[in-house]
Amino acid sequence: MATNTVNGVLVCSDGTNIPLKEELAEGTESDLKTDTVYTVSAMNVGDYAPGKTVVSALVSCDNGVGFCYILSQGLVAAIIPWSVKGAVSDGTPALCQPYTLKAGDIVRCMNNTAADREAAIACYTASGVSRIFKVTPTGGATNELVDLQTGNSIGDTLQGQRITKWFGTSVDGSKIETQGFYVVDALGNVVGSCSATNPIVQQPLFSFAATNIALNYKAQFLTNS
């Protein structure tokens, strides 16, 4: 696969900006390290600025983007807002809550082609948990988004928690036959909905939610092709 230049910045509470830049392969989740033009050597963010508290951030890819987050001790520690270059309307958005970097923390990014249909929901709960759910549709179907780390459903992953902020991304546009992404209960009733933004056209932004999650709940959307 081709590689593209992915850029980003993490803005810290003390005014420090951490510039990010890396040539990342399309279709492969990869580490996004610091920009050597400004930081001398390419480093993971936790090793470059341990103890700094990130309050806002943005990562931009050339053609398409699946998701981006800070990985800490094997878990999604913070969701980093993502976009395609030029499709930015809200500058560097605030994180759902400030996050203090630890040694070993890594920024992970999925750099995609423009044609890649990977869809994602970024969720933040009332208890401070951040998770990302994803799926790549291949035709007309009901597509379930599953946890990017475990492959589990939203019900298995966030059972007993309440989603308070989320956003969704998909390039499918008119192929989508639901109002964005739905969360359905065990009986198939819609209990939550999250709009789907095309990150090639518009920067996705978090919206407020109040969606309680229980066992056997699913996140899904319908496509016609």
PLM feature spans:
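Beta-strand-centric surfaces of beta-sandwich/beta-rich domains
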Residues: 1-225
